[in-house]
Amino acid sequence: SFNSDGTMDETLNVQRADTRNSGLFGHYNLGWDYDIDKRNTLAASVRFGVRNNHTFQDDLTTERYLNNTLTGSTLAGNENKGAFNNVDASFNYTHYYDKPQREFSFQSMFSRNTGNSMFENFLLDPVDGTTLNRFLNDNDSYNQEVTFQVDYQTPIGTTQIVEFGGKTIMRSVFSDFASYQAIGEGPYEPSAAAGFNNNLNYDQNIAAGYLAYTLALKNGYSIKAGSRFEHTVISAYTLTEDNIDIPAYSIVVPSLNVSKRLKNNNTIKASYNRC
């Protein structure tokens, strides 16, 4: 804005704070492979990860100036904590038949991410530093996925291969957050503000199957045609809404691949997929 003498008001905001942070990060991996015999193999792996962090912002002072004159100030602080871990595990089995290129495999995978995050804000009296009010938010959550897959392939003669298999995926997502308020150093009470307390429970189950056929021609061409079918069912609800209506759906995904083997072991490919 302009003053009566035509000059413009000058506003200035100044912030300063002391900050601290600490954290822990780590990953651990374990793998195992075992050949039962020349026809049967096992493989397993486990991966564990952890990520923790803790930060503070002390004496967050905000000063507002108008034309170099202090017009107001606030004093605040906050604390943030997060603890997260994840586990990924897999187990695979493969059986090789006496006939070349004929094999059966089973795969399973498990993945889970778990976390807790919390932040707390303090509003302090800028004169004596006493606590005026506090706000706390706490959130527990996890994501989980379990997968099972079976595959089988077998040759027909020396120029054809048939493949088929099935797969199921089970996903779960959960989040539960709650907010609390307190006056001064008094006890926390649940926040009555809309949208500050809720949870989400979400489950998704997918069943899929596929069939593919490969034909190798004498002129160096190879043709692979197939199709995949998926059916998905979803259920979800929250603290404020029961049985959210999410329709189940199915899709069919055809595919076609044509390749030509060239000299010097080079290959040219063309493919088509419809999503």
Where are these regions (language model features)?
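Primarily recognizes Gram-negative and organellar outer-membrane beta-barrels
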Residues: S1-C275
